[in-house]
């Protein structure tokens, strides 16, 4: 880990069907904080990001899932992979480090209900 904390890219997923997402980079992330604390931190930060369109700022995000870990293979999915949910969706009570988050990890942040709907019928609308 970097001395000042880790750099983590969070992909805000607004729509799975329309592949509508925006990446946000967080520097100095404490990997020993809980997933729940990081979710609160991101949700508090999103409305203040000038570069984000309004629909991203007002969306209800509640779930983090690992998309890519450093030195690992990337998925072919354009938004987020639909496999390995048990391993890759971060449990709110554990720490980021315990969940497998490291420096330069890429996470997806989305509404769990929308993810389940898309997973049941993974059809893109564009």
Swiss-Prot record:
InterPro entries the UniProt entry points to: UPF0538
Question: Can you tell me which family this protein belongs to?
Answer: Belongs to the UPF0538 family.
This chain belongs to the protein called: UPF0538 protein C2orf76 homolog
Q: Which organism is it from?
A: Xenopus tropicalis (Western clawed frog)
